[in-house]
Amino acid sequence: MATQGVLAKYRLPPLPTIGEIIKLFNLRAEKQLSQNFLLDLKLTDKIVRKAGNLQNAYVCEVGPGPGGITRSILNAGVEELLVVEKDTRFIPGLKMLNEASSGKVQIVHGDILTYRMDRAFPKHLKKPWDDDPPNVHIIGNLPFSVSTPLIIKWLEQLADRTGPFTYGRTQMTLTFQKEVAERLTASTSSKQRSRLSIMAQNLCNVKNCFTIPGRAFVPKPEVDVGVVHFTPFIQPKIEQPFKVVEKVVRSVFQFRRKYCHHGVSILFPEESRLKCTEQMLRLADVDPTLRPTELTMTHFKKLCNVYREMCDQNPNLFAYNFREELRMRKLQGKTTEEGEEDDLQR
């Protein structure tokens, strides 16, 4: 894992403050885009330090907005900074930073959810997966509305070694709502233990670095924000395809308030549900009366391994979709297990 970064001696020339940039270009945070600006450069410097040593690094910043974190990244002495910004209103301010940094900033007007990061940086930066992480980093103050789908997308690309992970074990330093940050890093039996905990910790060393109070942002969000650092493992804890792990974990946590056998059961069609659920839990040596939050990574590893074997024996099993069965039962006027529907809406 990279050592904690130290901001380099490089400094941008005098520039308008972030607050002045916002006034100069008449920028306002758009509520529908979940935008919140971080103006305190001491905090943006702290975020960048948590990314590790960025001297001569290649960095992709997600959603730079008015450029607070962007300035801190440039001051860390990076070789090149790629910024991906969806909102055209921020482009003029980012161009100003590019000029001030002698062309170190590449500006992409686009959506990070669809941007091809496998083409973002020079090929010579690629490192073998079992080597140290490449000198490539992802940093971003993520809009709340995209943070969860984005990290799930990146985790899948990490598992497949595609997207930003074509360069190797690319590290990420990202902001999330405090609750999401706690879920990503939650340990076994903690209240915040969730699907995100397993999916992230299966593939990465995940560290909740520090919390930024909501009052530090403009406009002030209703929640605090957590800064999370991800360093991909050489080998995942669960050596199964991402889709297999995701399906098992999602199913188990579908009924987080109940015993884990409820979630396991929805992996199987109604006609074989009881038999297959008992078989899977027995072969995985998992107590059916444990709650989902009480299951360790080893429990999930065993569950995924057994489920994969069962899918290999029954090629149609993986395609089974409990939600579709539930929809058909509703159309036919059949009732669901008490509380089942409420849990599925969560």
Curated annotation (Swiss-Prot):
UniProt keyword RNA-binding present: yes
What is the E.C. number? Answer: 2.1.1.-
Transit peptide stretch: 1-27
**Which superkingdom does the taxonomy of this entry point to?**
Eukaryota
Q: Name one GO biological process term.
A: rRNA methylation
Q: Which residues bind S-adenosyl-L-methionine?
A: 36, 38, 63, 85-86, 111-112, 141
Q: Provide the primary localization.
A: mitochondrion
Q: Which CDD domains match?
A: AdoMet_MTases
Do you know which SMART domains this protein is assigned to?
A: rADc
User: PROSITE patterns annotated for this entry?
Assistant: SAM_RNA_A_N6_MT (PS51689)
Q: Which UniProt keywords apply?
A: DNA-binding, Methyltransferase, Mitochondrion, RNA-binding, rRNA processing, S-adenosyl-L-methionine, Transcription, Transcription regulation, Transferase, Transit peptide
- Mention any Pfam family matching this sequence: RrnaAD
What molecular function does GO assign, one term?
Answer: RNA binding
Locations listed in the record: Mitochondrion
Family named by the database record:
Belongs to the class I-like SAM-binding methyltransferase superfamily. rRNA adenine N(6)-methyltransferase family. KsgA subfamily.
Protein purpose: Mitochondrial methyltransferase which uses S-adenosyl methionine to dimethylate two highly conserved adjacent adenosine residues (A1583 and A1584) within the loop of helix 45 at the 3-prime end of 12S rRNA, thereby regulating the assembly or stability of the small subunit of the mitochondrial ribosome. Also required for basal transcription of mitochondrial DNA, probably via its interaction with POLRMT and TFAM. Stimulates transcription independently of the methyltransferase activity.
Q: What is this protein called?
A: Dimethyladenosine transferase 1, mitochondrial
Q: Name the source organism.
A: Xenopus tropicalis (Western clawed frog)
